[in-house]
Amino acid sequence: MNSGQSFFVIGAFVVLSTLTLNVNASLINTSTTGLEMEATLDAVSIAQSAMDEILNQEFDEETANGVRVYDPHDLTPTMSFGTDSTSEKIVGDHGVDTSRTDSFESRTKFNDVDDYEGYARKTWNPRFGWFNVTVHVEYVNEDYPDELSYGRTFYKRVSVKVMHPSLVKDVNNEVVPYVIKDLAVYRRYF
């Protein structure tokens, strides 16, 4: 082989190597995106399941068992949100409700929406492992439900946040939690 042919062979190897690296990088990005999408779908399901559980509870401790409240000042004050007594305390992993089978203590111990304030849960997924779930409950303005209310109202905003290392990451490579919000509304049809 003369020197001209050697340069062509070396050039072909350079082009082939560059092409191989680009294809590999593309495959890695595609599989990462696929895993992020799958983890996000699982996070959606986990968050919605928790939200459904919460919104199926009574609006407030004071409205349990069919008791009617006519004045929002009769509702639980924000500083009393969370578990009401030791019988409602989660005794799991350091106060974190943990289950591999979806049998969480909150389902039998909590009886109203604001019991979930500060609640933490770990949900098992066979493909991704543990998802961390946290809940925040707060009163909101009845006319503008995006605004917090410093007093008691007949509206409570429930936020469910799900975290997992496989969720989508921002430009700083930080995990972006999946968050859903909904309103619990005390119906005043009386």
Predicted regions and their residues:
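Aliphatic-rich helix starts adjacent to a transmembrane/signal segment
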Residues: S3-Q48
